Structures are given as C-alpha cells and as structure tokens.
Amino acid sequence: MSELVEHIQVHVEPEYQAGESAPGDQRYVFSYTITVHNRSAHSIQLLARHWKITQSSGKVQEVRGKGVIGQQPLIGPGQQFRYTSRAVLDGPVGVMEGSYTCLDTTEQRAFEVPIAAFRLAGPNQVH
C-alpha cells in the first residue's frame, strides 16, 4: 500500500477571508482549496478525513468525518479532485494537518494519505 500512497499528491491553497472574519470577536475565517491528484494506475475513493487544527492560542481541535464536502469522490488514474472548505479560528494564525482514508478500488484495501501541515495566517502575520 505504501507504493500507492506515493502516487497520491495533495496540494493545499489557504486564503484568509477578511469579509467573513471579525477580529474584534476573535473570529478569523480561512478557506482552503485542496487538489488531490491520483498519479497511480488504480482508481481510489476518498472515504474519510481527519484534521488536526492548532490555533495560535495553543488550542487543538480534531475533526473527523466521512468524505469531504458531503462527497466520497472516486478519483480515476491520472485524475484529480478539487474542493474548497473553510476553518474558523479564534486567532489570526493556525496550522492544519491531517490525512485522508482512501480505498484502492482495484485491491479493495483502505490506506491513509497524509496531508502535510500548512499555515493559516491572517493579514500582517508572518507567513
């Protein structure tokens, strides 16, 4: 299975949402667009997600759920799946990292795809 994991790439593009944020109320909204590239010869299905969100206050939140944005997409060989979601933090800086549980539909085996840590930073914050 580790061989298949090496062929699944996850790219993240975070963005601060100033219009939805209220810093005076300690509400900082970030969107993140994720592209999952399947560079393997097998179709995969994204079954579940696990996020660890660390806020600037040190508070850690774990989020687990089925699929992403209400879907459990099937991603064929050479294809990609792109979606946008959001996170609301109590401070201007945070870090997200996690993993996807995917199914190799050829072998009918589940495997984990790690998502490297990425930074969420509001305006005038060090990136």
Swiss-Prot record:
A Pfam family name for this chain?
DUF525
**ApaG domain: residues covered:** 2-127
* Transmembrane regions: none
**What biological-process terms (Gene Ontology) are attached?**
error-free translesion synthesis
Name the domain of life.
Bacteria
Q: Which HAMAP family match?
A: ApaG
Protein name as catalogued = Protein ApaG
Q: Which organism is it from?
A: Chromohalobacter salexigens (strain ATCC BAA-138 / DSM 3043 / CIP 106854 / NCIMB 13768 / 1H11)
What's the gene? apaG
